[in-house]
């Protein structure tokens, strides 16, 4: 004998119902709340049977406004993590029903004030700034969404109102002050191409354009809004880096030329403190104006020499360090032009076996000067072996001892 799972009596009827793998009388299969007979579909919880409406009313999602259950066929609004009936999602001051995407302010997590009423009754209406709404007359007010024109300035605690099919938005908690982040959204390649094309057309899209992109890509409007914010920030950063790189490239491509440490020497300044001048403006008691080249009528020994570095070397001292002495006019028995030509040829073509003339080698220099001046010295006052004639021919102050001839 089969017993009914509802009334525990034997089933003597011709027909019976099998619910939850148990046999029931036809009249015993009914909703425990409204007592209506369940013929096609029923819901069970803790061994009790419910109809569809009563089951969702008792165990389904509750409306945060009226605390009643929400039927699967009802349209709802979402704000933060709470769900509301359409009739419960209204402004508490003007009773206007708030629509999707409209800006609002949340009070006590389940009461709402529209933007117009909040600004008209807030002390910050003069500033006309949504992100500073927390400094208004009611300190518990917090903005729920953000104006698209100000989305780059501040990431305020806001929520875009969406239908049940759209995802809920989690933002800053007013009391905790910590930002709650949802799961990371992965954007596919096709969706990314669509967003890039939209960004190329309008870098700062309106809400209507974002809604169209949400329908095309299947992404949440908040995700699209954040993607555009990050993209604009990246573009600004790249422009700043490119401008900085251009300035750096221009700086290193054409650096400032270093000025010479010593300006070009003017005539008469080659040896500022020396007794001889390489120009014709030198005057002394031994030489008149332009008398520097008396022994060289054709000019200096080298026609190309303009500085002491370019001039051929003539030793300034003998083997004992004695200066060569002063240069005087040639003796009457000599011919200045022929002797000067000979001296020029010998200096221009020094003997092959003579060492390199350096001031620190007085010995070899003495032998070279002996070969140069030989048996017929061009200068009558030149003394190589001693300093006797030097003292006879020159009574000039000793400051000339350190000077070089050429």
Swiss-Prot record:
DNA-binding region: 180-239
Keywords assigned by UniProt, alphabetized: Developmental protein, Differentiation, DNA-binding, Homeobox, LIM domain, Metal-binding, Neurogenesis, Nucleus, Phosphoprotein, Repeat, Transcription, Transcription regulation, Zinc
Cystine crosslinks: none
Subcellular location: Nucleus
Primary residence: nucleus
LIM zinc-binding domain residues: 4-54, 63-117
Post-translational modification Phosphoserine, affected residues: 162
Complex and partners: Interacts with LDB1 via the tandem LIM domains.
Descriptive protein name: LIM/homeobox protein Lhx1
Source species taxonomy: Eukaryota, Metazoa, Chordata, Craniata, Vertebrata
């Amino acid at each position: 004998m089969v017993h009914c799972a509802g009334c525990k009596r034997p089933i003597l009827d011709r027909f019976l119902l099998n619910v939850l793998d148990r046999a029931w009388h036809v009249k015993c299969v009914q909703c425990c709340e409204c007592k209506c007979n369940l013929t096609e579909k029923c819901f069970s919880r803790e061994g009790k049977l419910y109809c569809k409406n009563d089951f969702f009313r008792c165990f389904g999602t509750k409306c945060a406004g009226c605390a009643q259950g929400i039927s699967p066929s009802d349209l709802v609004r979402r704000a933060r993590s709470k769900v509301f009936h359409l009739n419960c999602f209204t402004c508490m001051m003007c009773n206007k029903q708030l629509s999707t995407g409209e800006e609002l302010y949340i009070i006590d997590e389940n009461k709402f004030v529209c933007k117009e009423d909040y600004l008209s009754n807030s002390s910050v209406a003069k500033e006309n700034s949504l992100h500073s709404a927390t400094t208004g007359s009611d300190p518990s007010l917090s903005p729920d969404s953000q104006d698209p024109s100000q989305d780059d300035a501040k990431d305020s605690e806001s929520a875009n109102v969406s239908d049940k099919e759209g995802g809920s938005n989690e933002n800053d908690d007013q009391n905790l002050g910590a930002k709650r982040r949802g799961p990371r959204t992965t954007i596919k390649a096709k969706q990314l191409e669509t967003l890039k094309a939209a960004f190329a057309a309008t870098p700062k899209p309106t809400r209507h354009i974002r809604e169209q992109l949400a329908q095309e890509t299947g992404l949440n409007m908040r995700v699209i809004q954040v993607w555009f914010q990050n993209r604009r920030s990246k573009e600004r950063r790249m422009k700043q880096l490119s401008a900085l790189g251009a300035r750096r490239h221009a700086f290193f491509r054409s650096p400032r030329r270093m000025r010479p440490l010593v300006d070009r020497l003017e005539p008469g300044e080659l040896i500022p403190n020396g007794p001889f001048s390489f120009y014709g403006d030198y005057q002394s008691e031994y030489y008149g104006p332009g008398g520097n080249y008396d022994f060289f009528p054709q000019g200096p020994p080298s026609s190309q020499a303009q500085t002491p570095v370019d001039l051929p070397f003539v030793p300034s001292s003998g083997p004992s360090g004695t200066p060569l002495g002063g240069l005087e006019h040639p003796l009457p028995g000599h011919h200045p032009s022929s002797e000067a030509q000979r001296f020029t040829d010998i200096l221009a073509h020094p003997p092959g076996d003579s060492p390199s003339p350096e001031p620190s080698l007085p010995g070899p220099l003495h032998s070279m000067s002996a070969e140069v001046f030989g048996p017929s010295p061009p200068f009558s006052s030149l003394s190589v072996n001693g300093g006797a004639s030097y003292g006879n021919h020159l009574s000039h102050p000793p400051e000339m001892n350190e000077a070089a001839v050429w």
